[in-house]
Amino acid sequence: MSRPLTPLLDCVLSPLDLRALPASDLARLADELRAEMIDVVSVTGGHLGAGLGVVELTIALHYIFNTPDDRIIWDVGHQAYPHKILTGRRDKIRTLRQEGGLSGFTKRSESIYDPFGAGHSSTSISAGLGMAMASALKAEERRNVIAVIGDGAMSAGMAYEAMNNAGALDARLIVILNDNDMSIAPPTGAMSAHLARLVSRPSYRHLRERIKLFSKKFPKFFSEQASRSEEFARGFLVGGTLFDELGFYYVGPIDGHNFEHLLPVLKNVRAYPNGPVLVHVVTHKGKGYAPAEESADKYHGVNRFDVVTGKQVKAQSTRLSYTKVFSKALIEEATHDHKIVAITAAMPTGTGLDSFAEKFSDRMFDVGIAEQHAVTFAAGIACEGYKPFVAIYSTFLQRAYDQIIHDVSIQKLPVRFAIDRAGFVGADGATHAGSFDIVFLATLPEFVVMAPSDEVELMHMVRTAAVYDQGPISFRYPRGEGIGMDLPQRGEVLEIGKGRVLREGSRVALVCFGTQLSEVLVAADELAAEGISTTVADARFAKPLDKDLMRRLAREHEVFITIEEGAIGGFGAHVLQFLAQEALLEHGLKVRTLRLPDEYLNHGSPEKILSRVGLDAKGIINAVFTSLGYETRKTLQI
């Protein structure tokens, strides 16, 4: 299929070109930009619906504000594809989320038009406030700072912390509330747009401030009544009372797809001399592409798809994903135990808990984008004798670390953590990599940390977590499919802190924590063909370690290598520390720890990246050869 014709967009190489266009051309530009984005994502995959919903808003912001001197901060970054196309990156847009290509999110190192990197939710207002106050400290600068945040991201407490601070500082900050869920939106018709234009005019705001000053000359009772009356009238007509309470001047709601509404309001807001303002813009997720409009949840993040039919291209496979195996196992356990409940932070589909909710709706809790609350909420449930499973991506669990320590671990509450997307995740890059959970959980006293090597082991760990009541317990598993094992109806209960040996050898011990075990077994086969006798062990637990197994392997082998898909300081570090304490390193044992490198890994194919960092079979074999002093095998027939 040929690419769409975009003659007007072809002339826009930067926001300078955009600002040279007459306003009458912007609607046509929006159509072309939307067509280009649909065509791009149909080839690359990525986040579609959010970007389609902000095409007009993106154009309007770059048209009215002097970017990059004025700062536009996109919360999360899912919606930033139109922004990237308009800011000089169109020639690379078809490399989106590919190794060496454009990031799927905003990224400071990628463009001067990306003043702040994103990937996680609800950070934009805090970052914007910091930039606004820095600008205020530079007396010669008068820079506009605009934070664009979705209504979903407003469920996170950090957004309100920032707004409360901005109001207290009376900071010159513009927040665009992109309301694409219609959850808090009053009517957005002609009257609403007219009122928004009216109250956004500097003259109206100036008059309002003068009346406030004048009212202070009267007794306090009269000034308070006047303020309440004005607040009630504005709230009744255009909403925004909550934001007024936080110290923001509220404007809206306005139609985020109508330039006649957007441009005058943004122009008026740009002229405000001081104080924070919130512009409430109502948009439609997936706007302009029927399949995405009709099924916003299915077109939030997409694989490659057919533009005409909207049908997504998915590889045919009989293997279940680890997420689906977890969901199946949890449902099975919940069938046997009415005290099991499931908790997610706005990711029911991504974590597989949507299936759990279909069967146990009263035991499923989606708390919104509120990871800190999710963990302490689970702690409260555990206090009452129930068995909470917090299903969460590894990268998002980082946001609740204080709650894990203070509210769960110190109190030894039996909260179960099902950690999805562990390890390198691929196209979403550094902001979404699940690299650190082993490190930050295994350091906590009496915190059980598990990782399955395959789908059956995952089922065992779900059941083990369900019956474990002595304190917090976690298990981590990657994005993607398992290795295709036949699954039992129900998992088995594992002995805490005990690993297993899959192969016995005499010279080299390969100890794996997690799903790289399949690569370890391939490596062991190749080593055996080279005459190197190899033991393969599945650790199962990073904490508590199987100390008896570690001692035996250290005493009986010449080389001891740990393998994990996690950061420095994880499983291998715990093993090494144990061996040192046991004086098992003093008699010539050669120890190597294979792990993710000490760097943030950018987006790319997981297979290619893991091969590059030495976590595939070839990398494991090379580690063995170098440990033994052999010449490294550059080309291996695997």
UniProtKB/Swiss-Prot annotation:
Role: Catalyzes the acyloin condensation reaction between C atoms 2 and 3 of pyruvate and glyceraldehyde 3-phosphate to yield 1-deoxy-D-xylulose-5-phosphate (DXP).
Keywords assigned: Isoprene biosynthesis, Magnesium, Metal-binding, Thiamine biosynthesis, Thiamine pyrophosphate, Transferase
Gene3D superfamilies with a match to the protein in the record: 3.40.50.920, 3.40.50.970
Pfam families: DXP_synthase_N, Transket_pyr, Transketolase_C
Family annotation (InterPro entries): Dxylulose-5-P_synthase, THDP-binding, Transketo_C/PFOR_II, Transketolase-like_Pyr-bd, Transketolase_C, Transketolase_CS
One GO term of the biological process aspect: 1-deoxy-D-xylulose 5-phosphate biosynthetic process
EC number: 2.2.1.7
Protein name stated in the entry: 1-deoxy-D-xylulose-5-phosphate synthase
Names of the cofactor(s): Mg(2+); thiamine diphosphate
Protein family membership: Belongs to the transketolase family. DXPS subfamily.
GO MF, one annotated term: magnesium ion binding
Residues holding Mg(2+): D151, N180
Chain residues that bind thiamine diphosphate: H78, G119, H120, S121, G152, A153, N180, Y289, E371
Record text on cofactor binding: Binds 1 Mg(2+) ion per subunit.
Subunit structure: Homodimer.
Record pathway: Metabolic intermediate biosynthesis; 1-deoxy-D-xylulose 5-phosphate biosynthesis; 1-deoxy-D-xylulose 5-phosphate from D-glyceraldehyde 3-phosphate and pyruvate: step 1/1
Catalytic activity: D-glyceraldehyde 3-phosphate + pyruvate + H(+) = 1-deoxy-D-xylulose 5-phosphate + CO2
